[in-house]
Regions:
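N-terminal Rossmann-like NAD(P)+-binding subdomain of aldehyde/semialdehyde dehydrogenases
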Residues: 1-109
Length: 109
C-alpha cells in the first residue's frame, strides 16, 4: 500500500475543505435573514455548550494557554459577541441614503 507524504496529504485536505466551503457559501447566499439568524444562534449555543471541551482542546493542541482561560474566552464569544451581533441585518437592503443615491445591500458569504 502506498503512503501519502504528510505535506501532500495536508494540501489535499485543504483543497477538500475549500471545495466544501465554496459549496456552503453558495447555499448561504440563497438564505433569508431568519435562516442566517438561526444558524448564528445555533453556532453561539453550540460554542457555549462546548466551551470547556473546546478550551481544553485548544490548549492541548497548541501547548499554550490555560484551559480555563480558553473556556472563558469561548464563553465570551458565545455570549457577548453573539449578543452584539444577533440583531444585525445581514441580508438584503441594510441602508438607504436617498440623498446620495446609495443603497447598501448585504449578502451572506
Amino acid at each position: 500500500m502506498m503512503t501519502l507524504d504528510p505535506d501532500l496529504q495536508s494540501i489535499q485536505e485543504v483543497r477538500n475543505c475549500l471545495a466544501q466551503a465554496k459549496e456552503a457559501q453558495k447555499a448561504l447566499e440563497k438564505m433569508s435573514q431568519s435562516q442566517i439568524d438561526a444558524i448564528v444562534r445555533s453556532m453561539a449555543a453550540a460554542a457555549e455548550k462546548e466551551a470547556e471541551r473546546l478550551g481544553r482542546m485548544a490548549s492541548e493542541e497548541t501547548g499554550f494557554g490555560i484551559p480555563a482561560d480558553k473556556k472563558r474566552k469561548n464563553l465570551f464569544v458565545a455570549r457577548q459577541v453573539y449578543g452584539a451581533i444577533k440583531d444585525m441585518k445581514t441580508v438584503g437592503i441594510i441602508r438607504r441614503d436617498e440623498q446620495a443615491k446609495v443603497w447598501e445591500v448585504a449578502q451572506p458569504v
